[in-house]
Amino acid sequence: MLHLVIADAELETIPEEMQADPAIRRFAKKRNKRVDRMILDSNYMHTSIDRYFPNESKRRGRPDIIYLLLEMTQESILNHKNQLRTYVHTRNNQVIRISPITRMPKSYNRFIGLFEDLFEKRIITNNGKELLSMEESSLGDLINSIRRDRTILLHPKGEMRKPSEFISNANILIVIGGFSEGDFISDTSFINERYAIFDQELTIWSVANEMVANYERAVGLT
């Protein structure tokens, strides 16, 4: 089993500091949504994010990169064979568990609506089957709750290795940063296996794709 943990993901509802912002309120009215139930999205709110969080404006509000990653993982051969578990840990220490049977909406706007429902309801079901669930948890507590043989952190400052050199057919937990720039907010010092897979910056979904594809080969699926 491969456990993919997307850590410190920039997926959150509108922070309290921003909820009175006129541009945010206009956008909420346009969508017929309560401000505090909308997901922060820099595609539409970059100017407001830059106003309230000037040092983080290039990082925060990136649900789009989580969407692209989940589109790939949930449609992978590994997931179809029930050998992949994906978890999204957010910057606010919320953990989203993605059921293997869950398929992401093909529309980004529908994805946003789905996850806004999740933030409000904490669980999404279909015909009695759980698709998504959310709980409060730190990264460390999440990792400790998962049975695995090895824990690996992917980090630009890690040892440079090809994925095929460190991925085996064991129960592996791999931590990938859920942000577009910067470093982890959560403590990751307890993870000793640290690797970089390329000498240039990669998107988080391309990194996840490399992990999934190499694990598929390790277990003989491809």
Curated annotation (Swiss-Prot):
Residues at which S-adenosyl-L-methionine binds: 177, 182, 197-202
EC number, as in UniProt: 2.1.1.-
Statement: the UniProt record of this protein carries the keyword Signal: no
Name of the top EC class for this enzyme: transferase
Record HAMAP family: NEP1
Site keyed Stabilizes Arg-62: positions: 64
Key words of the record: Methyltransferase, Ribosome biogenesis, RNA-binding, rRNA processing, rRNA-binding, S-adenosyl-L-methionine, Transferase
Name under which the protein is recorded: Ribosomal RNA small subunit methyltransferase Nep1
Reaction equations catalysed: a pseudouridine in rRNA + S-adenosyl-L-methionine = an N(1)-methylpseudouridine in rRNA + S-adenosyl-L-homocysteine + H(+)
Task of the protein: Methyltransferase involved in ribosomal biogenesis. Specifically catalyzes the N1-methylation of the pseudouridine corresponding to position 914 in M.jannaschii 16S rRNA.
Gene Ontology process terms (BP): rRNA base methylation
InterPro entries the record matches: Alpha/beta_knot_MTases (IPR029028), Rbsml_bgen_MeTrfase_EMG1/NEP1 (IPR005304), Ribosome_NEP1_arc (IPR023503), tRNA_m1G_MTases_N (IPR029026)
MF terms in GO: rRNA (pseudouridine) methyltransferase activity; rRNA binding
Residues at the site labelled Interaction with substrate rRNA: 62, 103, 106, 110
A UniProt-annotated Pfam family: EMG1
Gene3D superfamilies cross-referenced by the UniProt entry: 3.40.1280.10
Family: Belongs to the NEP1 family.
Assembly and binders: Homodimer.
